[in-house]
Swiss-Prot record:
Its EC number is 4.1.1.48. NCBIfam families: PRK00278.2-2, PRK00278.2-4. The gene is trpC. GO terms for molecular function: indole-3-glycerol-phosphate synthase activity; phosphoribosylanthranilate isomerase activity. GO terms for biological process: L-tryptophan biosynthetic process. It comes from Halalkalibacterium halodurans (strain ATCC BAA-125 / DSM 18197 / FERM 7344 / JCM 9153 / C-125). Keywords: Amino-acid biosynthesis, Aromatic amino acid biosynthesis, Decarboxylase, Lyase, Tryptophan biosynthesis. It comes from the Bacteria. Belongs to the TrpC family. This is Indole-3-glycerol phosphate synthase.
Length: 257
């Protein structure tokens, strides 16, 4: 499936037309996750569909969802912009970014500099880079180019082999451990526990995918995760607020003394 997605992405890049620059205030994803509103940082995802689950939320209003996430204490928002496989759109990200004050990450299969330029123009604060999609040397180039253009990066790994390959090239500021195998699309939260053993102590990392319950969050917290990226369980909830409350076991948002 991943190979098919990447081939589609390469074809899209060939005909990519860059939009006009959107003027928005940049907000740091790194800073938001370093000082989360709850015991774990929450990167809440705006996600209509996926290849593995099909349509996740038919009643889909990205701006309303994004504003609800912010009101419920999410630290940042991830917006799917892939159209073909996730029914996302880059305009969703722009509209969400214009409506909230917390960081917004572009979640897509970013493999080319043109997509980084596009991400800047649509107003993203950060982008996702996936180790399994491109050679590590190229990923490092994209990482550096993104930072030069004012974008932060969440660098995603799944296996011990990928993380060894990544760290042999460079150490990102923020890592995402995907509990989903992108080749089989199967998920296992134990992947975060396993990967935590090989991530250097003190490195910020998120657990991604397959997180549905308070117990799931406690597992990855014990493993050392800085935060979580959650989409499906929040999108399937009766409301984003209810979904976040359920996920965090009713834990309130921290208030400054």
């Amino acid at each position: 499936m991943l190979d098919t997605i990447l081939q589609t992405k390469r074809e899209e890049i060939e005909r990519l037309a860059l939009p006009e620059q959107v003027e928005v205030k940049k907000v740091s994803l790194y800073d938001a996750l370093r000082k989360p509103n709850r015991s774990l940082g929450l990167l809440a995802e705006v996600k209509k569909a996926s290849p593995s689950k099909g349509l996740i939320r038919a009643d889909f209003h990205p701006v309303e969802i994004g504003k609800s996430y912010e009101a419920a204490g999410a630290d940042a928002i991830s917006v799917l912009t892939d159209e073909t496989y996730f029914q996302g759109h880059r305009d969703y990200l722009t509209k969400v970014k214009q409506a909230v004050n917390i960081p917004v990450l572009r979640k897509d299969f970013i493999i080319d500099r043109a997509q980084i330029l596009e991400s800047v123009r649509i107003g993203a604060d950060a982008i996702l880079l996936i180790v399994s999609t491109i050679p590590t040397t190229r990923l490092k180039e994209l990482y550096d180019e993104a930072h030069e253009l004012g974008l932060e990066c969440l660098v995603e790994v799944h296996s011990e082999e990928e993380i060894a390959e990544l760290f042999s090239a460079f150490t990102p500021t923020l890592i995402g451990v995907n509990n989903r195998n992108l080749k089989t699309f199967e998920t296992d939260v134990a992947q975060t526990e396993k990967m935590a053993q090989v991530i250097p102590h003190g490195t910020m990392f998120l657990s991604e995918s397959g997180l549905y319950t308070y117990d799931d969050l406690q597992r990855v917290k014990r493993a050392g995760a800085t935060g979580v990226l959650v989409g499906e369980s929040l999108m399937r909830a009766s409301s984003p607020e209810e979904g976040i409350q359920h996920l965090f076991g009713g834990e309130p948002v921290a208030t400054d003394a």
